[in-house]
Amino acid sequence: MSRRSRSRASSAARITDEQIGDLVSKLQALLPEARLRSNDRVPSARVLQETCSYIRSLHREVDDLSERLAELLAAADVSTAQAAVIRGLLM
């Protein structure tokens, strides 16, 4: 690949500040607490930190619910076929 074509390829792959801002705004709209203050200008770093925290909390919630479901399965009178389907979903 020539130097000129590499330069064109790398510039085409670059994302603009406007695109980053748009993506951060969309990400902020997905955060439950951020929706309340969607009109406020929040720094991108803060949105990313809140997103990471939210994802971690969702992981914890999934783990807790999976554990709870496993306990219910162990205690419930569930047919073998139903239990196999539910266990398969948990994996």
Swiss-Prot record:
UniProt keyword Transcription, yes or no: yes
Annotated ranges, domain bHLH: 4-58
Highest rank taxon of the organism: Eukaryota
MF terms (GO), sorted A to Z: protein dimerization activity
One of the protein's GO biological processes: regulation of DNA-templated transcription
InterPro entries assigned: bHLH_dom, HLH_DNA-bd_sf, PRE
Keywords: Growth regulation, Transcription, Transcription regulation
Family of this protein: Belongs to the bHLH protein family.
Free-text function comment from the UniProt entry: Atypical and probable non DNA-binding bHLH transcription factor that integrates multiple signaling pathways to regulate cell elongation and plant development.
Protein's recorded name: Transcription factor ILI7
Organism of origin: Oryza sativa subsp. japonica
Organismal lineage: Eukaryota, Viridiplantae, Streptophyta, Embryophyta, Tracheophyta
Protein's gene: ILI7
